[in-house]
Swiss-Prot record:
Key word Disulfide bond present: yes
Domain of life: Eukaryota
Source organism: Gallus gallus
Example GO biological process: defense response to Gram-positive bacterium
GO CC annotation, single: extracellular space
Disulfide bond residue pairs: 30-58, 37-51, 41-59
Descriptive protein name: Gallinacin-13
Signal peptide: 1-23
CDD domains assigned: BDD_Gal13
Coiled-coil region(s): none
PANTHER family: BETA-DEFENSIN 1 (PTHR21388:SF9), BETA-DEFENSIN-RELATED (PTHR21388)
Protein task: Has bactericidal activity. Potent activity against E.coli, L.monocytogenes, S.typhimurium and S.pyogenes but mot against S.aureus. Has bactericidal activity.
Pfam families, per the entry: Defensin_beta
Length: 89
């Protein structure tokens, strides 16, 4: 009888050990890649995957500026400006 109890305990322990056999969870992988699990990413973050089995997003700080406008950041000269000139030719 004691052997059956011991075998039952071993089987239960083995059944509960399947999570580490699958590898890291997606939340742990997100943290390892310098990300944060959030419901929505902030405007300076990019979506880099999922967390909590797809319920949350893995957000990482992006190096790109998401709201930059190239027209206002670069000065255009008359040669680069594609708009027609108002002066006569």
């Amino acid at each position: 009888m004691r052997i059956l109890q011991l075998l039952f305990a071993i089987v239960v322990i083995l059944l509960l050990q399947d999570a580490p056999a699958r590898g890291f969870s997606d939340s742990q992988l997100c943290r390892n890649n310098h990300g944060h699990c959030r419901r929505l990413c902030f405007h300076m973050e990019s979506w880099a995957g999922s967390c909590m089995n797809g319920r949350l997003r893995c957000c990482r700080f992006s190096t790109k500026q998401p709201f930059s406008n190239p027209k206002h950041s670069v000065l255009h000269t008359a040669e680069q400006d594609p708009s027609p000139s108002l002066g006569g030719t």
